[in-house]
Amino acid sequence: MQKNNLKNLITTIVTNAFFNQKANFSIPLKGVIGEKRPSILIGNININFKSDSLIEVSFPYYPLLNKNYPNPSIISNIIQKALSNHLLYSSKNYSFIVNIRALPISTPYGSSLIFSKYIAIIIGSNPKIASTLWIDPKRFINLPKLQSDSIFKILGLNVPKGWKGIHISLNLIKWNSLSSRGRITNIIKGSVPLTNNSNGYDESSLAIYSKMGTIQIKVRLSYSSNL
């Protein structure tokens, strides 16, 4: 795929996965036993900053009905086919929740800059939200250098059964002394487990402090045991 096509694809996935309440991206596979999850590196994406960032589309999987797993070697081929066709297939039985994350590649600014770029991609993919937060997203990413890289954490949402929607809420706080330090907080995760045939959700929240101010981001994934 050409680089422009990759840009369009990443924008489409981010926009739908994080801003459409009923977004549903699934791959008709049955998952793989163990901790390893199928993923595909789609290349260097120019996101209009000083340098490109490596972006990875990761497909966490959750077997929903049975434990008959396919050969892991075919997973990447099917995902590649789905991406090359600009399509992400759906399945009634086996869901792949799409997470888009920045890889912790080597950078003089450490992982906080990479993570901030990842957040900027999410926000920047929706012009309406981006325009209400700031005029120049580049300035928002102007974070100071870190002495060492911290353990890179992704914004992950685990779904035990099925899922029916995802939404993200944003809140921009005015400049303050804390934001001038240019730090990011740890991700705080929490989930509400499913009860008997009822609905639940898995929620993550984080905050990024920068010279432009503080932005608080919360993502909630709703799911239902009836799916």
From Swiss-Prot:
One of its GO terms (molecular function) is structural constituent of ribosome. The keyword rRNA-binding does not apply. GO terms for cellular component: mitochondrial small ribosomal subunit. It is found in: Mitochondrion. Keywords: Mitochondrion, Ribonucleoprotein, Ribosomal protein. It holds the Pfam family VAR1. GO terms for biological process: mitochondrial translation. Transmembrane segments: none annotated. The keyword Glycoprotein does not apply. Belongs to the universal ribosomal protein uS3 family. Component of the mitochondrial small ribosomal subunit (mt-SSU). Mature yeast 74S mitochondrial ribosomes consist of a small (37S) and a large (54S) subunit. The 37S small subunit contains a 15S ribosomal RNA (15S mt-rRNA) and at least 32 different proteins. The 54S large subunit contains a 21S rRNA (21S mt-rRNA) and at least 45 different proteins. uS3m, uS4m and uS5m form the narrow entry site of the mRNA channel. Essential for mitochondrial protein synthesis and required for the maturation of small ribosomal subunits. This is Small ribosomal subunit protein uS3m. It comes from Schizosaccharomyces pombe (strain 972 / ATCC 24843).
